[in-house]
């Protein structure tokens, strides 16, 4: 039976000592940890000057911004007032936690309060850390000026020490990176060989000045004769890098947003926290601006109905040819153009283009007929929206003038292809039939430099174009078409390769584009033009079934077919080759040599490289274990004027005689060296044999044996009957008849 209330002990009569009770374990478990120190305080600078009467209004206005990142109140804002009754233009603010104080520094620093005042927000502990007594020396100490040391010439490689005008290339295999001279048929000459030089891949800058190495901490640029580090850009976990055409600026991207800890960052600031892209000034090594990823729209969903994220578009920031502008596409709405080096938005606003799908800068400054001021140019395209047709446009920057537009109908997709001199723009338009069951391709070619930018249409193509490539510095192009739907299958679809060029016209004009020839029943999927034009390789890459390469000459010097008399080309297949498992094909910058390679990044079978000349003759083949990359070193644009280049072309035959003689002399000297080496080896062997014979003779004399080892045999043969016949029997079996009997 439970005790009644009357039987319970009276707590007032119960005698005990509170100090004897041990509740330390409960206190340790449940005690609320109060924030210590000044971590919850921030200092706000840049406030307007107020007096005691207007101070409450400013605090009330300020609270609206402060409450957007954390919890604070009117009593937590302390705004000192001076003896003259006016504020000191700063205030102390207390938040409820250090996390909110850090968030306030990130979100409110640099935010405009009004047109004349911009907030500067810092943690109070930072001010104490960097500004307390002893941190700054009161006495001025002049900086120590280091002794001048001359920097290395970053383009010294252009003066080949061998005097042969050789090109360099970088090869990445296993964990080693090598830079080498190309020696054609002979083994390449190593310049530098380093282990663990990069963590993912290497990349040349557009003019070959720098070699880029990728690291978890960021990007490093190397160059000069001694291959020392020239620059470093601290972007943690960087994945990709892109240079401006003139090597003035650099874009780095990481799929991980940047995180700036309390200890800070050597190059980036709190403003860069949470960003993925950083645009750098290469000369100073400083960041110009950072950007976050954009959420790319996607029309496809997974099995659970969630939208599938699209792959990142690279490069996301595209450079103008003169390095003065960089632009970014917000797909479906706008193009943002930024002025360099300040990275301010052009005219402080993005260019609104409804539905815009893609854009691309002209690779050179186009000199358009009838235009006095030459500006940069970019093209863009928009799909059909409602009853509005698809559209291709050309816009001039910085004026933002729309130079030319073209309406298109029944468009499924479009691709933009600039010619290297910006003389032409080809828009490859995939159109669907009314039933939307079949596709066909037309080529809309904008003649950019001609007055009014006329458009020529090549619509005689019945199949779908899967590849298109302009001739560099020329006006001819190659396309690859297929009648089948291209899918990721082991057996590639049958394709056709077609060549086009302008027809001849009087004067300096360029005629209409005409079809030269088509080669059917191919497996080709890639086009590689020589950087100097004229020669082109049509190949099959990334295939498990076919590895063909065909070398074509567009200006063959032989007899021209009658059907091509009115065309500006004489097409000839020079050679064919194959490289098992080929994944990459690279022309050297002079157009003399071609390297084909099979990278372990794609497959592990027969990795290595082949080297060909421009005619398709194989010069060298080298299997390389764990081969990853081969990249020719680019060359900067020539410093010769057009007149000087014309003079060189005029005397090219005379120069060729000198070069041919040098090649012959070098080949003869190489042959002579081989002969001398073999003769030296033979002389060494004959001398060794003579010494050994002397030693054997001495040993036989000491052993009492005849000097000639064959002397006993000769004596025995001499003592026998010379005329005695020797009978030799040989048994030969011959099959006379053969029968076959089946036994059941």
Curated annotation (Swiss-Prot):
Q: Name one GO molecular function term.
A: translation initiation factor activity
> In the UniProt record, does the keyword RNA-binding occur?
yes
Q: Where is this region: Disordered?
A: 1-21
Q: Which Pfam families match?
A: eIF2A, RRM_1
Coiled-coil-forming residues are none
Where does the record place the RRM domain?
40-126
Q: Does the keyword Protein biosynthesis apply?
A: yes
This chain belongs to the protein called Eukaryotic translation initiation factor 3 subunit B
Which species? Botryotinia fuckeliana (strain B05.10)
Q: What is the lineage of its organism?
A: Eukaryota, Fungi, Dikarya, Ascomycota, Pezizomycotina
């Amino acid at each position: 039976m439970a005790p009644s209330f009357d039987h319970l002990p009276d707590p007032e009569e119960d005698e005990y000592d509170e100090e004897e009770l041990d509740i330390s374990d409960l206190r340790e478990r449940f005690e609320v940890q109060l924030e210590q120190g000044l971590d919850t305080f921030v200092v706000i600078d840049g406030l307007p000057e107020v007096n005691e009467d207007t101070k409450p209004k400013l605090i009330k206005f300020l609270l609206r911004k402060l409450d957007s990142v954390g919890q604070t109140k009117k009593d937590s804002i302390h705004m000192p007032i001076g003896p003259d009754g006016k504020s000191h233009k700063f205030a102390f603010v207390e938040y409820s936690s250090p996390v909110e104080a850090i968030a306030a520094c990130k979100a409110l620093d640099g935010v405009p309060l009004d047109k004349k005042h911009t907030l500067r927000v810092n943690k109070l502990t930072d001010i104490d850390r960097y500004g307390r007594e002893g941190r700054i020396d009161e006495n001025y100490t002049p900086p120590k000026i280091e002794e001048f040391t001359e920097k290395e010439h970053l383009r010294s490689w252009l003066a080949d020490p061998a005097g042969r005008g050789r090109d360099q290339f970088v090869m990445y295999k296993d964990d080693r990176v090598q830079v080498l001279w190309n020696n054609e048929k002979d083994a390449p000459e190593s310049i530098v060989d380093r282990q663990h030089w990069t963590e993912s891949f290497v990349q040349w800058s557009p003019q070959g000045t720098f070699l880029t190495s990728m690291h978890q901490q960021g990007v490093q640029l190397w160059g000069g004769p001694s291959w020392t580090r020239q620059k470093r850009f601290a972007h943690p976990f960087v994945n990709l890098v892109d240079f401006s055409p003139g090597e003035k600026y650099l874009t780095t991207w990481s799929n991980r947003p940047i995180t700036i800890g309390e200890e800070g960052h050597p190059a980036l600031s709190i403003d860069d926290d949470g960003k993925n892209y950083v645009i750098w000034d290469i000369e100073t090594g400083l960041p110009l601006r950072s950007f976050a990823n954009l959420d790319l729209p996607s029309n496809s969903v997974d099995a659970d109905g969630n939208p599938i994220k699209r792959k990142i578009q690279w490069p996301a920031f595209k450079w103008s040819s003169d390095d003065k502008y960089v632009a970014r596409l917000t797909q479906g709405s706008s193009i943002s153009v930024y002025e360099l080096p300040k990275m301010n938005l052009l005219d402080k606003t993005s260019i609104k283009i409804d539905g815009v799908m893609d854009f691309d800068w002209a690779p050179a400054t186009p000199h358009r007929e009838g235009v006095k001021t030459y500006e940069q140019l970019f093209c863009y395209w928009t799909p059909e929206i409602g009853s509005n047709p698809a559209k291709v446009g050309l816009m001039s920057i910085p004026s933002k003038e729309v130079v030319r537009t073209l309406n298109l109908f029944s468009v499924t997709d479009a691709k933009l292809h600039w010619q290297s001199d910006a003389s032409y723009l080809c828009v490859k338009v995939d159109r669907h039939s009314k039933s939307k069951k079949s596709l066909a391709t037309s080529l809309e070619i904008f003649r950019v430099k001609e007055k009014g930018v006329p458009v020529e249409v090549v619509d005689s193509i019945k199949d779908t174009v899967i590849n298109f490539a302009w001739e560099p510095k020329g006006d001819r192009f190659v396309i690859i078409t297929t009648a089948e739907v291209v899918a990721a299958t082991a057996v590639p679809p049958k394709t056709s390769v077609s060549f086009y060029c302008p027809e001849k016209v009087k004067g300096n004009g360029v005629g209409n584009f005409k079809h030269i020839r088509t080669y059917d029943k191919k497996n080709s999927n890639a086009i590689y033009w020589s950087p100097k034009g004229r020669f082109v390789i049509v190949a099959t890459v990334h295939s498990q079934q076919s590895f063909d390469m065909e070398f074509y000459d567009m200006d063959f010097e032989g007899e021209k077919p009658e059907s091509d008399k009115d065309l500006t080309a004489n097409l000839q297949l020079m050679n064919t080759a194959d490289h098992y498992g080929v994944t990459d094909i690279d022309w050297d910058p002079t157009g003399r040599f071609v390297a084909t390679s099979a990278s372990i990044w794609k497959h592990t079978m027969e990795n290595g490289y082949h080297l060909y000349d421009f005619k398709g003759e194989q010069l060298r083949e080298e299997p390389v274990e764990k081969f990853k990359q081969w990249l020719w070193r680019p060359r900067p644009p020539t410093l010769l004027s057009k007149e000087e280049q014309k003079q060189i072309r005029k005397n090219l035959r005379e120069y060729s005689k000198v070069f041919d003689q040098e090649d012959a002399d070098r080949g003869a000297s190489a042959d002579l060296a081989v002969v001398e080496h073999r003769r030296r080896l033979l002389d060494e062997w004959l001398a060794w044999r003579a010494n050994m014979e002397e030693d054997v003779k001495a040993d036989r004399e000491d052993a009492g044996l005849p000097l000639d080892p064959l002397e006993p045999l000769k004596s025995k043969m001499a003592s026998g009957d010379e005329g005695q016949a020797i009978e030799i029997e040989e048994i030969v079996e011959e099959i006379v008849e053969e029968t076959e009997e089946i036994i059941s």
